[in-house]
Structures are given as C-alpha cells and as structure tokens.
C-alpha cells in the first residue's frame, strides 16, 4: 500500500506489534470509569478549541453506537473516541516537538506531514500519562488517521466514527451511515 511503501508506519517502536483485540485489551478501570471519562473530557476541553471538542464528543458517541452494533466494547470505544484528537490542538512545530519529546523515530516522509502525527503522539502521550488505558485503545487512537493493514475491530470502529460523527455532512457520509449494521 501507499502507506507501507512510504514507511509511514515506522513510528512504531522496534518490537512493537499490533494489538489483536476485538473488545479491547484490558483497561477495564479506565473504560468503565465515568469519573475518569469526565476528567479526561474536561481536560480535553482545555486542550482543543470548541469545534474540535464538539467533534470529539460526537466521535465518542458515534464510536459507542458502532461498538454496540458490531460487538466491540462500548466503553472502550467511547473513551477512544473522546481521546482520539488529544494532540490535534498542537500546531505543526508543536506536534514535531511532541514527537521528539516522546522519542518517536519518524521517517522523513512522515515528518514532512505533521498534521497526520496527532494520533501517534496522542497515543504515546496518553499511554505514558494514563497507564490504565489499554493497549487496544491506544492502538486505535494511533491508527485513526492513517489506518493500518491489520486493524482490529476497535481500530475500525474509531476510524469510521471519526468519519461519520454527527458534525460531518454530505451525501457520501449519509450513504455510509445507511450502511451501518448491514
């Protein structure tokens, strides 16, 4: 694929592999903890602008709905939806500085496209700051922009929820929404 040929997955550390999880991978305390969810929601509101915050709430709700339809852990999906744009408020120099701070080894190609790094940096920073988050949730956040050849069900739920949340409009989006559950 284009992504593989360009080495866009090189941000994955040596020895790291994909999480093969339909329902998540642990993290019960975080995904089913409403105070944790509420605290992260409040923190997110201070990190991103109002439009991005509404988008994240919409992705969270949509991810929960999709998870219900497709048999994926709803709490894990809601939390992934809420947190997926955790680093989206950073500008290009800020996102590159964040990647450096986190010790990410990025290909030149990926470094030249800082707008797509927010999922990768968010996943790494959230994993560091909130170790109770599951590897499956963090993987879904990392992959929500570029995807991956071996996406888990949770990865796909978040990827699609980001595209279909209520703030997105258009014939293509409406057509995709009608396909849910078919």
Predicted segments — roles?
Residues 1-39:
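Non-catalytic terminal extensions that flank enzyme cores
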Residues 39-47, 55, 64-182:
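Divalent metal-dependent catalytic cores for phosphoryl transfer on phosphate-bearing substrates
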């Amino acid at each position: 694929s284009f992504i593989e040929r360009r080495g866009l997955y090189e941000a994955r550390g040596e020895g790291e592999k994909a999480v093969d999880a339909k329902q998540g991978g642990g993290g019960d305390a975080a995904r089913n903890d409403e105070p944790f969810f509420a605290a992260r929601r409040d923190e997110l509101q201070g990190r991103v602008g109002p439009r991005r915050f509404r988008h994240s709430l919409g992705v969270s709700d949509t991810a929960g709905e999709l998870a219900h339809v497709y048999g994926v852990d709803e709490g894990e999906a809601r939390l992934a939806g809420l947190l997926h744009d955790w680093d989206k408020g950073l500008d290009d120099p800020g996102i590159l500085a964040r990647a450096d701070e986190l010790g990410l080894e990025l290909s030149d190609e990926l470094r030249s496209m800082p707008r797509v790094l927010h999922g990768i940096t968010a996943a790494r920073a959230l994993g560091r700051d909130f170790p109770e988050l599951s590897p499956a949730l963090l993987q879904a956040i990392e992959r929500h922009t570029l995807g991956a050849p071996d996406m888990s069900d949770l990865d796909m739920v978040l990827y699609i929820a980001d595209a279909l949340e209520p703030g997105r409009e258009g014939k293509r989006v409406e057509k995709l929404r009608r396909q849910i559950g078919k």
